[in-house]
Amino acid sequence: MNVEEMKKAVAKEALKFIEDEMVVGLGTGSTTAYFINYLGKLLMEGELEDVYGVPTSHQARLLALEAGIPVVSLDEVDAIDIAVDGADEVDPHMNLIKGRGAALTMEKIIEYRAGMFIVLVDESKLVEYLGQKMPVPIEVIPAAWRAIAEELEVFNATAELRMAVKKDGPVVTDNGNFILDAKFARIEDPLDLEIELNTIPGVVENGIFADIADIILVGTPEGVKRMER
């Protein structure tokens, strides 16, 4: 089973948690895209009914509409039953780094409010500690990015402004902000660092998701494995 097959396997496994009349938070990224497509197929075939999606990004919204999933905004629903999203790193305590898709702020808002948060990853995303492979994305007010990058030196972190690939200039989030990718030597206390980073003036949100995931579905060559609290 290659990586894409692992992604498809965990996406299909996540469908087992979806029931009629649910409001589902739809994450951003390649693995979640499979889930959105599969969910849309079940709705089109009548195997699920009255399921609504709350997208975490413009990308997720467009994918949901293409898949035939009715889309609503966060302020149109009283509650989110379940949220499904990917992650860039997962530590043994189910803490996450997210945000390579630059949608981390809405992801955290929606997933924090969900009754259940399910994370979809392949086994390459499992790490011994957060920061082992990936930097922590930090969404920042554009005018403050340089000052915040300097402030992060207090945390022994090196931060780089994320630049766009298919256009000139930096990546701009759906909220109109910039992304700093901050590399930490080792994140010993993810929850503490998550809170501390958000106290820096100009920081909108950061990509540490500590103590928030309920179930993590991990794609492996042997099949889907589950981590849960």
UniProtKB/Swiss-Prot annotation:
SUPFAM superfamilies documented for this protein: D-ribose-5-phosphate isomerase (RpiA), lid domain, NagB/RpiA/CoA transferase-like
Cysteines paired by S-S bonds: none
Catalyzed reactions per annotation: aldehydo-D-ribose 5-phosphate = D-ribulose 5-phosphate
Annotated residues for binding of substrate: 28-31, 85-88, 98-101, 125
Alphabetical list of Pfam families matching this protein: Rib_5-P_isom_A
Pathway of action: Carbohydrate degradation; pentose phosphate pathway; D-ribose 5-phosphate from D-ribulose 5-phosphate (non-oxidative stage): step 1/1
Any one GO BP annotation for this protein: D-ribose metabolic process
Active site positions: 107
Keyword Isomerase: yes
Keywords associated with the record: Isomerase
Quaternary data: Homodimer.
General function of this protein: Catalyzes the reversible conversion of ribose-5-phosphate to ribulose 5-phosphate.
Family indicated by similarity: Belongs to the ribose 5-phosphate isomerase family.
Name of protein: Ribose-5-phosphate isomerase A
Organism: Thermococcus kodakarensis (strain ATCC BAA-918 / JCM 12380 / KOD1) (Pyrococcus kodakaraensis (strain KOD1))
